[in-house]
């Protein structure tokens, strides 16, 4: 697997910064039922207590809470869909997995027997649940901003969402430096954290709009 170079990533930034400021779209939903497993969904239920229903956030210990309980401000990991597509590149055939792919055991659709015969949608390697075609920058969505998403409402939290070693293993060192750069953090290229305020159903293609 050949990772995107920094030059390719920088060239793709022009498209990213033209993401809608409002009235965006939910492009991809990914549930993580267990560590290293991804389920690409057409729709999902968001719950104020559980986050994305069926996702392992509600049972996964957090190193950022005193009692290691799930962090309430990290219920939802949200990434810009254009950034995800940029760093991921095209789907990878199963015969061309990188070590990072094998380590996480990611599937393109679901987690059933047929998944073994499907190419890997490398966007899902990021590990986020919601991928939005929306400007996620700090300037456009400061902490506390609420968004209508399907019949749910979510709120952007102040908890940082930055790239880590796993991100580097899956997308390359250049991608990690790209999202963690000064401008990358300002634009939230790695994404943002959010919590569910009003529960509801969300579907791929749903409009995402600022509340108020």
Question: Where in this protein do the model-derived segments appear?
Answer:
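Metal-cofactor-dependent catalytic cores
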Residues: 1-212
């Amino acid at each position: 697997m050949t990772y995107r170079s920094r030059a390719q990533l920088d060239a793709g930034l022009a498209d990213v910064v033209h993401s809608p400021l409002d009235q965006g779209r939910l492009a991809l939903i990914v549930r993580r039922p267990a560590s290293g497993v991804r389920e690409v969904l057409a729709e999902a239920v968001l719950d104020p207590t559980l986050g994305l229903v069926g996702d392992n956030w509600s049972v996964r210990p957090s190193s950022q809470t005193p009692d290691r309980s799930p962090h309430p401000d990290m219920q939802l990991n949200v990434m810009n869909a254009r950034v995800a597509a940029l760093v991921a590149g095209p789907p990878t055939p199963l015969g061309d997995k990188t070590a990072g792919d094998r380590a996480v055991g990611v599937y393109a659709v679901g987690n059933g027997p047929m998944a073994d015969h499907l190419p890997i949608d490398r966007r899902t390697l990021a590990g986020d649940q919601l991928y939005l075609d929306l400007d996620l920058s700090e300037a456009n969505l400061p902490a506390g901003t609420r968004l209508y998403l399907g019949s749910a409402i979510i709120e952007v939290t102040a908890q940082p969402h930055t790239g880590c070693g796993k991100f580097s293993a899956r997308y390359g060192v250049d991608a990690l430096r790209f999202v963690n750069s000064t401008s990358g953090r300002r634009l939230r290229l790695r994404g943002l954290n959010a919590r569910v305020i009003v529960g509801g159903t969300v579907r791929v293609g749903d409009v995402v709009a600022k509340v108020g």
